[in-house]
């Protein structure tokens, strides 16, 4: 929200300096984002060229004699092609800083001729990119006066950042009201008396809507006959230009001016272009309108328009139509001031992709009691600037605003903020903010003004009192120290999240943060799409569902990188997924994808050979590493073949702890899944559920145990077992490991063989067993006994026999 200092002072009687106003705005919650006081222009003056003669030593230079208004002409050397006798321009004197050149002027000689200043171009003053000649002002421009004052460039521009709840400050009057309440001046009464009209407005307004659920809660219309439309006055144009608006003509500029002045959007129709009456109705599927931005918009039945017999003339509350717009030929003008449903405005604007100042205000909620005064203000300006004869203001469908009343115990300020504010101070603050107040010395009965639709309860009143009284008046209090070491601050889930994140990053994966919202198609592809997980008001059509998995977002991110030349990429995310609409259905998950040749050991081409594409075992290793880092008992994890439907059925697995606890899934993606998501390439991924890891039975130590190393040499033994073809290698590994958990420290599968020599339906699984004695060197008898234990364990758990 931008405004100039002089514009603010139209509403605020104050002697405060610019710095004081800026500081106070931030103190009361209207954060100042920038201030342009345009001090660089103050030194430049308007000057007239008396004579222009050719430079004796340069064909392209002229020696000017310049009148500065004090009767003492100044000699200036100038190379501008438009420099001539009689031109009125802008003079910079020695000592003046030229912002466009980043230089400070001084007396100098140019080709032997002294120059005591500089005639400036627009680019040199950073007014525009025009530099083909020096500034050429009107002949009647007052010579010797400040150029900044003449052009309105001496008025500082302030820009503040508004939070969505402060709709009242989308108008300069609302900002002035807050400053007055904060003690920085007095709020002026700028509302004009009602304009006395003659005769009824010939164009009637018809509200075609559901009376029980209206989208238009008030419509005011007035005609002003016999206007003379043309350029708006200089003061209005200067203010509009200062805040970034382009002046068009007086009638249009008046509506823009009132929008920013009062926070009340308006619209004007050329009455001669309106056929019949105006009807506020829903749009019809397929209707189109050529809007004022010269773009044609296709409407649907969920949108609302102001239409006449020709069809839509305005997209309600957002933008008018080109057909009925006002131009220099307008004689009779219709002034519209209406109230629109904020949700309808937001939805329509989002669907059409239109962002306007009117939409910005209506979707936040405008002051309902300013509908009629806004029309009166605009009428008064039209009569002053364009003349004409007004009709009686026609108001349709408007119901007086019902004010909200809140009982406010002043003790709530202390309870919620720690700020000590007396009853009298709180009473006075709310009164200055425009609240109706009465009370008994302890509780204030506050009536919320119409422009503060965001104030709904006691906590909101606490905020109002606190920000005006001054947050900076809260005395700092040091945190108490009890002389003891703090206990663990992070929760178990937070610790798991941190450890999993560090582990995946250490494996060469890059962390990504993706949206929690995905499209319906993506959600259904990953087991989601439940009705309760659909957003009532999605920010985009392809972000309609809460995600049931991290993988859709990561796959899309990987594809975006691949499309830009980064095909070998590994991404991970540790965040939440949603299985339902209750808090217990939100899960903490670590997920990741690898694409191309993005393996742990490196990607791309090497002297020893190209890296292989990623596959199921890369995803498995990532999943187990994340679980181990998060504290899962990986030695007890069971790996079952097959995963969810979005993974390849023969190249995926499920990580389980017992028959019921699922810790995660991993694998290569199903081709149908990749096709549905428009993703290509070698891709694998995993998800592990950090909240499914069981709590350790024993309390975990805060420090790592001491490193224990055996004094005795380790040794390896190989075994080959013949088992049924359906037996998984993991079961054999588990059986071997359980034979002697103290002595056996590692089991590795190194060969799987099938053949006729083994018999039908049989296969051989060979494993390498790593033995680590702790207290003595193993004898042949020890090894023989261990071998018997291993063979017996495998036979018992898998039915396998030692291969001969």
Swiss-Prot record:
Which keywords has UniProt assigned to this entry?
Aminoacyl-tRNA synthetase, ATP-binding, Cytoplasm, Ligase, Magnesium, Metal-binding, Nucleotide-binding, Protein biosynthesis, RNA-binding, tRNA-binding
Q: List the disulfide bonds.
A: none
Q: Which reaction does it catalyse?
A: tRNA(Phe) + L-phenylalanine + ATP = L-phenylalanyl-tRNA(Phe) + AMP + diphosphate + H(+)
Q: Where is the tRNA-binding domain?
A: 38-148
SUPFAM superfamilies documented for this protein: Anticodon-binding domain of PheRS, Class II aaRS and biotin synthetases, Nucleic acid-binding proteins, PheT/TilS domain, Putative DNA-binding domain
List the molecular function annotations (GO) for this entry.
ATP binding; magnesium ion binding; phenylalanine-tRNA ligase activity; tRNA binding
**UniProt protein name:** Phenylalanine--tRNA ligase beta subunit
Recorded GO cellular component terms are: phenylalanine-tRNA ligase complex
